[in-house]
């Protein structure tokens, strides 16, 4: 496995909470849009937004990889995008990483209300290659793609 580190940010290590999830069985394309939406938000605000998207009360805007994503009437105008979706599986894993980073920050004694999503990113993970047997001795490739999620929350 290749060496991996968090990005070097100009933040004191005692003032941030970090979390990473490796090889999550989630689409990188969905994760990209989820990460872009909550980057820079307050942690409580981000969790509330993700909860509204899970309940389909508000659509998650799609800036990229939006081919076929229809326009949604419940997207806020602040996003300046019309197309969106409800990527529930991606939100589930991002929320888990966000909660882990929040718990790590609380363990360092940081104030929960002042925490902000300083860095969040999604990267391609490993590809699990499988073959599905078919009729007449043939086989079809089946690729399970995974993704990595990294979150850093810091006190503002």
Curated annotation (Swiss-Prot):
Pfam families: Ribosomal_L22 (PF00237). GO terms for biological process: cytoplasmic translation. InterPro entries: Ribosomal_uL22 (IPR001063), Ribosomal_uL22_CS (IPR018260), Ribosomal_uL22_euk/arc (IPR005721), Ribosomal_uL22_sf (IPR036394). GO terms for cellular component: cytosolic large ribosomal subunit. Belongs to the universal ribosomal protein uL22 family. Part of the 50S ribosomal subunit. This is Large ribosomal subunit protein uL22. The lineage of its organism: Archaea, Thermoproteota, Thermoprotei, Sulfolobales, Sulfolobaceae.
